[in-house]
Amino acid sequence: MIADALTVCIVVLSRLMYRKGIDLLLTAIPRLCAKHPDLHFVVGGDGPKFVELEQMREKHMLQDRVELVGAVRQSDVRAHLTRGHIFLNTSLTEAFGTSIIEATCAGLYVVTTRVGGIPELLPPSMMRLAEPCDDAIVRETDAAIAYVRAGRHDPLKQHRVVARMYSWDATVRRLEAVYARAMLTPPRSTTERFRRYADAGGPIGGKIICMVIAVQIMLVMVLDWLVPTSSLSLAP
């Protein structure tokens, strides 16, 4: 079990902007530091919210507990991540959290907002999901700190699992499966496609979308007449 006196380090690596949920971080950090006197933050990244983080640190007198390292070069990402025990992500939108994969591969336990494709990235045992609000982030981070302190987190085991999940071989297999499913989907007729466009856009927007698509189809027909597809060399 990790001794209670050991400082727990939470790492943040993000573009410091609104979309990345830095406003949530500005609220969560003082609350977490007040609850855990032995907590330390290392925040990497640059952006328009950097000044606000500095102001928050000064307001709550956390200069010795919140380290703002600025922009982190790609070659230094691993060194930045391995300074901590927990990785905190507060994004408001995220399609695929590359930084989360990097953090788990570096052995960090993850606390992240439940947005976009993040819930599908990793097994529940490797991360805690929070709704994008400061109360939920503080609550899940509290739980993560307790989890790490109890010695239940195994960084080396986690690294091995993630390395297998996101190896090139595994990634290629999943990508091939996506293409295979797409190829099995029967092509839609032009009429059906226009009907779907009209339904999606509503009474006015649907008509505009259909007009734009019709112009695009006519443009393709003209280009195909000028440069027939049969005259093009296809890639192997």
Segments from the language model and where they lie:
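Conserved donor-binding/catalytic core segment of Leloir-type glycosyltransferases
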Residues: 2-29
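Nucleotide-activated donor-binding/catalytic signature segment of Leloir-type glycosyltransferases, i.e.
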Residues: 54-72
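Short alpha-helical donor nucleotide-sugar binding micro-motif in glycosyltransferases
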Residues: 71-72, 79-84
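Short alpha-helical segment that forms part of, or immediately flanks, the ligand-binding pocket
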Residues: 78, 96, 101-105, 119-120
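Aromatic "clamp/platform" in nucleotide-sugar-dependent glycosyltransferases that forms part
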Residues: 92
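Short hydrophobic beta-strand element within catalytic cores of glycosyltransferases
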Residues: 109-112
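Conserved acidic donor-binding segment of nucleotide-sugar-dependent glycosyltransferases
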Residues: 124-135, 144-149
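C-terminal amphipathic helix plus adjacent low-complexity
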Residues: 164, 169-236
